[in-house]
Amino acid sequence: MHQRALLFSALAVAANAQQVGTQKPETHPPLTWQKCTAAGSCSQQSGSVVIDANWRWLHSTKDTTNCYTGNTWNTELCPDNESCAQNCAVDGADYAGTYGVTTSGSELKLSFVTGANVGSRLYLMQDDETYQHFNLLNNEFTFDVDVSNLPCGLNGALYFVAMDADGGMSKYPSNKAGAKYGTGYCDSQCPRDLKFINGMANVEGWKPSSNDKNAGVGGHGSCCPEMDIWEANSISTAVTPHPCDDVSQTMCSGDACGGTYSATRYAGTCDPDGCDFNPFRMGNESFYGPGKIVDTKSEMTVVTQFITADGTDTGALSEIKRLYVQNGKVIANSVSNVADVSGNSISSDFCTAQKKAFGDEDIFAKHGGLSGMGKALSEMVLIMSIWDDHHSSMMWLDSTYPTDADPSKPGVARGTCEHGAGDPEKVESQHPDASVTFSNIKFGPIGSTYKA
């Protein structure tokens, strides 16, 4: 994900476990989804969702004293990373009451502001202790989404990252929390706002955010490949692969992490920019939005296909295709209107041409490009989230960005939102009731999840 305001992880060090609290039982909201076959028949799967550990109450193992309040650590309980992991526990979640997360059948609704809480990030579970893993290669992933209540500056995201299915418990055996409590997060920004990474707290070097009352930046980050199927609001949308040098989660240190949270964006082992297909950025301003061809005032079905060179589930990723279904009509993705950039799907040729046309540094190719992304797609965890952006106010998605660039230059205009419209303070005060609803998740071979 290009920039992410709210992030996390939690695991444990040998002999210094991150603990599990006993103040509230953890009950995962149920969520059904469908697994389809080549013949187009689908069977219902009984899953559930879990909220990321970074959102959870973190308190002393001995009582209810907070280990973390606002965006600062309790220095007595957390003088260093190892002591903090030993002294502190994450606890169960009140999904609806605290986080504004509700499910019904196949439907998941994420509310933006609930009390003091802002945003959320949920993972699809296979069972109570394990994230659901997906092999996207030679398959397609389909879901319905309602973005009508997502104004400028918000992002209702559905994406995959190469997290460990157990949240890291087997790699760090003293991790007592694991996937059940939403541990193990990583992405291509190598996020440093995570309170726990690889079994240790992230308190050493922690700097509270100057503009986010709930977040800060620590000394470590958590990196892994990320496949952004859907980053969107009612104005703009983007699909973006982000490869990394390693196909699984790794920990980084300081500004060597790169990404949004570091002084040098391209210093790390991942591609923080990715190769994005945003119809508006690719020159088609009438395709996606309120009253447009894909009308964001109504629910839509989003289909994403992962084509391999040899047509097998183990082949090299060669193309990522997108289409929509709305009001019973299949809508092909918009075609690029940018000079010297052709097509309506993501391929190696498209990415190379797009970077050149936009004058962007080709960090995508540096970290393996499309084939590198494909190497990570066999074991991916599904994430659904709602968030605002304390780094760049989501202008990279729905406005003109960089802010000092000429809007008429190719690649600068990404949507119709005005500068400042997505300022987190503004959207949190003016649109606390914003929300996104995902439903009818389907997964299976190419062509099996929708009616042509």
From Swiss-Prot:
The record's Gene3D superfamilies line, in alphabetical order, gives: Glycoside hydrolase, family 7, domain
Picking any one GO molecular function of the record gives: cellulose 1,4-beta-cellobiosidase activity
Which residues lie within the region annotated Disordered? Answer: 406-432
Keywords in alphabetical order:
Carbohydrate metabolism, Cellulose degradation, Glycoprotein, Glycosidase, Hydrolase, Polysaccharide degradation, Secreted, Signal
User: Which Pfam families does the protein's record reference?
Assistant: Glyco_hydro_7
Instruction: Please name the InterPro entries in this protein's record.
Output: ConA-like_dom_sf, Glyco_hydro_7, Glyco_hydro_7_sf
User: Where does it reside?
Assistant: Secreted
Similarity comment text for this entry: Belongs to the glycosyl hydrolase 7 (cellulase C) family.
EC number(s) per entry:
3.2.1.91
What reaction does this catalyse?
Hydrolysis of (1->4)-beta-D-glucosidic linkages in cellulose and cellotetraose, releasing cellobiose from the non-reducing ends of the chains
- Main role? The biological conversion of cellulose to glucose generally requires three types of hydrolytic enzymes: (1) Endoglucanases which cut internal beta-1,4-glucosidic bonds; (2) Exocellobiohydrolases that cut the disaccharide cellobiose from the non-reducing end of the cellulose polymer chain; (3) Beta-1,4-glucosidases which hydrolyze the cellobiose and other short cello-oligosaccharides to glucose.
Q: Which CDD domains match?
A: GH7_CBH_EG
- One record GO biological process: cellulose catabolic process
Signal peptide segment: 1-17
* NADP as UniProt keyword: no
Q: Which SUPFAM superfamilies match?
A: Concanavalin A-like lectins/glucanases (SSF49899)
Active site location: E226, E231
Q: What is this protein called?
A: Probable 1,4-beta-D-glucan cellobiohydrolase A
Residues bearing attached sugar chains per UniProt = N81, N284
Q: Where is the composition biased (Basic and acidic residues)?
A: 416-431
Q: What is its main location?
A: secreted
Q: Which domain of life is it from?
A: Eukaryota
Q: List, alphabetically, the GO terms of the cellular component aspect.
A: extracellular region
Keyword Cytoplasm attributed: no
